[in-house]
């Protein structure tokens, strides 16, 4: 009886150790999986290194091309010219359910205006990643075609643009027409200034390329009076006297 109890106690100890080891292994696996899971969530990059097991040159080329992705910015045209929703806007434009179409048209109007918002003279679709208001006001204060444009006109344009893009209020037909009028006026002023500046540059280049007419050369001869002809410099007289003395000395020898 005692031997059987000792055997059962030994079995219990073994079972306890086995179950304890199993629980410890399961807890270790669970904790490890949770740590790896949170580590993957916090990582911004891919779970597998880019270019894994690739040659060094190929891996560098992949990294260079991936670094250029963040500089790629594109904003497509919201409403195509043949969009069927434009017909609905023309027939039922006064209804408030179509206000989102006026917002889309307002953003596309920047593209259609062809105003050189960039100082380099390019015609961007829009100013992505920039504050349109501060950028346009900066152009107004610099030596660009925007210099001196009325602040009220720019404020009207920018208020309409920001309301159409970011605002939560009503942007219907009347707001769009007011915005379009300000945009057309600004485009007219800027294009007129660009045209006058180009004409000035062309006229200046034309003046530089034209060779001046050759005027006939005149030769002016000044005759000295006889009293001034006899006047010679003092050093010339001294040189002549030295030459005469030298000739006299040479003849005596």
Curated annotation (Swiss-Prot):
Superkingdom, taxonomy of origin: Eukaryota
Segments crossing the lipid bilayer: 11-31
GO biological process: one example: phagocytosis
Coarse class of the protein's main subcellular location: membrane
Domain notes: N-terminal region is required for phagocytosis of Gram negative bacterium.
The protein's role, per its UniProt record: General regulator of phagocytosis. Required to uptake Gram negative bacterium by macrophages.
The name this protein goes by in its record: Protein C1orf43 homolog
